[in-house]
C-alpha cells in the first residue's frame, strides 16, 4: 500500500530530469513513474510518506522552474486503491483483463482471409474496419485480431493491427 503520492507536471524534458533528480536527493521518496503527455510535457510521480512527498515536490518545483515551467503539483495522502491502480497504469502495468473462456476461436480459413487482407493494407486496420469488410460483428473481428496478436502474428499500435515484419 502506498503511503502518499506526489505528482509534478512540468514542461520540458530537461526540467523533468532536473526535477526528478532534485526530488530524489531532497527526500526519502521513490520515483514511481513518469508519463509523457504531450511533446515536452511530463508528469513525474513519487511515493513516500506525506512529509517526504511535500519536501520532494518543493525541491522538484524549484529545480524545474530554473530550467523550464511547472504546470501543476499535488500531494495525495493515503491514496485510494483505484488511485493506486491509475498510477500503476502510468507505470505500464495495468490490471490483467479477465479472458472469457468461451471466446470463439477463429477458424483457419477466417484467419487466412484476415491475414491476406492485412497484407494488402500497409497502414493496418482497426477492428471496426475488419468487421465492416467481412460483415462480422465487431466483437468477432476484435477477437480474431486479438488472437492473431496474442499468437505473435500481428502487432498493435493504438487501435490498429498490422502484420509483424519478418
Curated annotation (Swiss-Prot):
It is found in: Bacterial microcompartment. GO terms for cellular component: ethanolamine degradation polyhedral organelle. The keyword Transmembrane helix does not apply. Residues 4-88 form the BMC domain. This is Bacterial microcompartment shell protein EutK. Its main location: other. InterPro entries: Bact_microcomp_CS (IPR020808), BMC_dom (IPR000249), BMC_shell (IPR050575), CcmK-like_sf (IPR037233), CcmK/CsoS1_BMC (IPR044872), EutK_C (IPR032298), WH-like_DNA-bd_sf (IPR036388). Keywords: Bacterial microcompartment.
